[in-house]
Amino acid sequence: MGMRPTARMPKLTRRSRILILIALGVIALLLAGPRLIDAYVDWLWFGELGYRSVFSTVLVTRFVVFLIAGLLVGGIVFAGLAVAYRTRPVFVPSNDNDPVARYRALVLSRLRLVSVGVPVAIGLLAGIIAQSYWVRIQLFLHGGDFGIKDPQFGKDLGFYAFELPFYRLLLSYLFVAVFLAFVANLLAHYIFGGIRLSGRTGALSRSARIQLVTLVGLLVLLKAVAYWLDRYELLSHTRGGKPITGAGYTDINAVLPAKLILMAIALICAAAVFSAITMRDLRIPAIGLVLLLLSSLIVGAGWPLIVEQISVKPNAAQKESEYISRSITATRQAYGLTSDVVTYRNYTGDAQATAQQVADDRATTSNIRLLDPTIVSPAFTQFQQGKNFYYFPDQLSIDRYLDRNGALRDYVVAVRELNPDRLIDNQRDWINRHTVYTHGNGFIASPANTVRGIANDPNQNGGYPEFLVNVVGANGNVVSDGPAPLDQPRVYFGPVISNTSADYAIVGRNGADREYDYETSTETKNYTYTGLGGVPIGDWLSRSVFAAKFAERNFLFSNVIGSNSKILFNRDPARRVEAVAPWLTTDSSVYPAIVNKRLVWIIDGYTTLDNYPYSELTSLESATADSNEVAFNKLAPDKRVSYIRNSVKATVDAYDGTVTLYQQDEQDPVLKAWMQVFPGTVKPKSDISPELAEHLRYPEDLFKVQRMLLAKYHVNDPVTFFSTSDFWDVPLDPNPTASSYQPPYYIVAKNIAKNDNSSSYQLTSAMNRFKRDYLAAYISASSDPATYGRITVLTIPGQVNGPKLANNAITTDPAVSQDLGVIGRDNQNRIRWGNLLTLPVGQGGLLYVEPVYASPGASDAASSYPRLIRVAMMYNDKIGYGPTVRDALTGLFGPGAGAAATNIQPTEGGAPAASPPANAPAPAVTPGSAPPVAAPPVPDGSVTLSPAKAAVLQEIQAAIGAAKDAQKKGDFAGYGAALQRLDDAITKYNNTK
């Protein structure tokens, strides 16, 4: 019986077709329009930065990959459909109840749509997915050799880094394409009658059999290739219960042979499948496929499991020894922990120290950091904010400069940025928000070893940082009293100013100056941006594009935008670096520095791999998490790596946004590959100026990854490694408010790398014994230009108290707890413990230092800024405690120990001005034992004092005597009261006629 006539589809009128086309056009515009606008804006932005080649290279690469992958997958699927259609049976028996006949008629009526539309849709999807792998493809095209061969196959590591990922990608796409072609061919033959399921056995046409078995055979061949590549991936895979990343005993002696056996079986099965092309019997290929499946279960899974349970587990330490050695070597290479970088030295950790030995460690004791950058931000806000819209981040940064005497000091530094989210009332108006309040103003630095005066009570004047300020002053001139001269303190780019939903500012001269700049006693002064950065928006096309980009009609109608106007956007320094170098992973810490009289943000960039043979696979998020990262929500991306290099140092100019990339690691093959992909974008290391090199620091995230790996991979013996008996732990932060690991600390101290008493800027961390609270090691990474990147590990053999035990001993000391109880006034005042520093001093000793802060009231109100109230120390089992570093050192080691910490300058006046910042900050005092006040001149015999002045002088002398007596007795409350009496008496003396 023949087929029923096909029901005709109703024809569309011309008007209907036009309406459908318009609707499709609107939908396409809504879908593609925003992407086209973003692409055009990015083209403008990259061009303004001078990195348009990056944009064009990425765009062209993505497009070419999209095109090739789409054509490959879509073409194979189309071929499967086309061949099935061309070889369809001429006559297909059918009846009125045949459901396939309806589908056949529908497909034939829309043959072009189905035969072309389906492959195109699949090709588009495949291309969209494939273009996201442009990084892998560019590395394949430009990757080179590492100069290191893997220990199993003898291949250069460049094969694993650059070639193997591409081969895997290509194989995956071929497998998907052939599988989809098989499905399409199968359905086409079924619809067109090449496959019929009627009757007891059904029927299969010759052409259908040939095409389907050919596609199945190709799939089996691709599986054989996959088995071959699996061999290489064994060297970087992880398996439960295995102590290392990479191939272990079972992998090499069972899994690896199994892969070769399975590959051979797959080739035999492929031949069996292809045999069905000439033989009508399909039982042979079916048997072959079943054999392959059973072999994968028995040979691929069963045999390795038997070897693991019977041979390896009873003798695991010996069996895995060779492969653990491979992992130790590879992990050290991959994470920059080889012997030419890391130096191990024995260190007792509990040696006795004399006062003279401690005093001789001037580089350490004169630089003991009292300012905790996670605590003192409210003090910066209190004294240096100036206006409600200026802002300091909750966590400040640490950098180093030479002080006025040429000594290396570390400073707590911050940029006074504008925070658009703190604008209020009329300040939030679009014109004010984006054209008036456009920039921050000022670089603030506080010597980390210094506070202004001594506070024995949170309500007293003292205990706050000394502020060195670079700022536009009240007369419009740049006040440059900071640690280095600065020509332009205005800040248009930074992490705070960009942290808003509408991150842009419109600048440029259009009539009178309109950007808020500073205030005099009588008026507000405005400013006009003159930097090179910014995208011009003077023409109507640009205004229209940005109106669409930010969904803001004021771009079109506001008269504040003129022919010279420019727009600054994407102002976050780290995001700018990630945009121009999309192959970099940036450090979570961005810090400001003055370099050659310019204010710049410095960002560390990493190149990474996730398939370095035998190197441990590490999660950046978990490895870099510490109490600061958790508290301030600055966790690194959840990215797994087995190779990392701090290959790039980047700077972003805070005024004009210029991004500069410098090569830091000249040996990194990954960086070399990317420098070929994007030639001219990364400057050679030789272009790093000496001024910039002085502010480059060893990056925190890299150090945290390395210290976590050193906890295991400092072990040389594989048997000891397997037993974990000599492993270390990263200590938990002992602060009761913390909930994660103790962060590493930047300090200026004696030079651990050179093992001498010169001053060195370094990043340090204590390490505990495995699952214990005793110290195992002390790690220091040098940031000095001459020894940059050298890591020194002081291994500590005895039972030396770790950070938690030291903190417990300090906080529970009766004298400490009693004194802080008085200061806290039954929790009316808030006591906060600062960072617990671990400092090598003397000839083999370790000094713990923990500053204590107090703020009035128990709240976190901005006005309740913390003041340094005490300094607590511990050396061996002895506690030192006092208002100053010198007092605490003297309590520990005796008189003279704090000689280097007595650089006291007279403090004149009270607190620094809060708004605007003081143009000339008053001298500060490094806490010592002397009262932090300016003593009146002692009259000689030729000077006659008035009776009132003479009486006040006696009060001063009495207060000094009381302070000395209280200090000798260790009466800190009495000492503080005497200092307050002295302060009041001196003020009274100066005001007495």
Curated annotation (Swiss-Prot):
Give the way it sits in the membrane: Multi-pass membrane protein
| TM stretches of this protein | 18-38, 63-83, 113-133, 175-195, 210-230, 254-274, 287-307
Q: Which domain of life is it from?
A: Bacteria
Localization, per the record, is: Cell membrane
The Pro residues compositionally biased stretches are 929-939
Q: Which Pfam families match?
A: UPF0182
Chain residue ranges for the region called Disordered: 903-941
Keyword Cell wall biogenesis/degradation in the entry? The reply is: no
Alphabetized NCBIfam families for the sequence: PRK00068.1 (NF000825), PRK12438.1 (NF009097)
Name of protein = UPF0182 protein MAP_3291c
The species this protein belongs to is Mycolicibacterium paratuberculosis (strain ATCC BAA-968 / K-10)
